[in-house]
């Protein structure tokens, strides 16, 4: 019973974006440290945002852009720009 509750909480937390399993859902941040939000009228194209940060592909997940295979060192926008200079 306790195992089922623990697994259920783990699944709910990973779906809500509270935790990431195996580094799959990594949310990039802009220059001010904010997440890129999507699902609104002027939403950014998450694939373009994630490729700018060095990830392979991106998608909208829980109203935030999520990147696949995004290195944690490239999560912040300024760290990516600093490497290009």
From Swiss-Prot:
Source domain of life: Eukaryota
Subcellular location, principal: secreted
Pfam families the UniProt entry points to: Toxin_3
Keyword terms, alphabetized: Disulfide bond, Neurotoxin, Secreted, Signal, Toxin
Protein name in the entry: Neurotoxin 60.35
Any GO CC annotation of this UniProt entry: extracellular region
InterPro entries, sorted: LCN-type_CS_alpha_beta_dom (IPR044062), Scorpion_toxin-like_sf (IPR036574), Scorpion_toxinL/defensin (IPR002061)
PROSITE patterns noted in UniProt: LCN_CSAB
Cysteine disulfide links: 38-60, 46-65, 50-67
Any GO MF annotation of the entry: toxin activity
Tissue: Expressed by the venom gland.
Signal peptide: 1-23
Protein family: Belongs to the long (3 C-C) scorpion toxin superfamily.
Comment text on domains: Has the structural arrangement of an alpha-helix connected to antiparallel beta-sheets by disulfide bonds (CS-alpha/beta).
Subcellular location: Secreted
The organism of origin for this protein: Lychas mucronatus (Chinese swimming scorpion)
Domain LCN-type CS-alpha/beta span(s) in chain numbering: 24-85
């Amino acid at each position: 019973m306790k195992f089922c509750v623990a697994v259920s909480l783990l699944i709910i937390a990973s779906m809500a974006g509270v935790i990431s399993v195996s580094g799959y859902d990594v949310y990039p941040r802009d220059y001010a440290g904010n997440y890129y939000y999507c699902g609104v009228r002027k939403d950014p194209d998450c694939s373009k945002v994630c490729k700018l940060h060095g990830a392979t592909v991106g998608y909208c997940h829980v109203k935030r852009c999520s990147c696949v295979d995004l290195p944690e060192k490239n999560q912040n926008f300024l760290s990516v720009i600093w490497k290009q200079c």
